Amino acid sequence: MSAQPVDIQIFGRSLRVNCPPEQRDALNQAADELNQRLQDLKVRTRVTNTEQLVFIAALNICYELAQEKVKTRDYAANMEQRIRMLQQTIEQALLEQGRISERAEPKFE
């Protein structure tokens, strides 16, 4: 289904954005989280300028996203390494099994 206009409140300001109906709940949750972050930042930094708070929050969110990307990349590399090790272990076990069964099979000629 196509995107539909949705009104959300961000730090006391109304904002209309287009959003697919199935993503409306996620959008509202994101707006709630942003509102909470802005409120926490306002209390913590004592900055009252909304624009400045939004920029600080955006920088914090971008930093957190960059950190998560690094963690995800590291995790994926670690999993690839583990999969390669498992493949090598399985291949080695199959080779060993093949050698054992070759010795154990009687040969009839």
From Swiss-Prot:
The keyword Cytoplasm applies. GO terms for biological process: division septum assembly; FtsZ-dependent cytokinesis; septin ring assembly. Keywords: Cell cycle, Cell division, Coiled coil, Cytoplasm, Septation. It is found in: Cytoplasm. One of its GO terms (cellular component) is cell division site. The keyword Coiled coil applies. SUPFAM superfamilies: Cell division protein ZapA-like (SSF102829). It holds the Pfam family ZapA. InterPro entries: Cell_div_ZapA-like (IPR007838), Cell_div_ZapA-like_sf (IPR036192), Cell_div_ZapA_eubact (IPR023771), Cell_div_ZapA_N (IPR042233). Residues 21-99 form a coiled coil. It comes from the Bacteria. HAMAP family: ZapA_type1 (MF_02012). Activator of cell division through the inhibition of FtsZ GTPase activity, therefore promoting FtsZ assembly into bundles of protofilaments necessary for the formation of the division Z ring. It is recruited early at mid-cell but it is not essential for cell division. Belongs to the ZapA family. Type 1 subfamily. Homodimer. Interacts with FtsZ. This is Cell division protein ZapA. The gene is zapA.
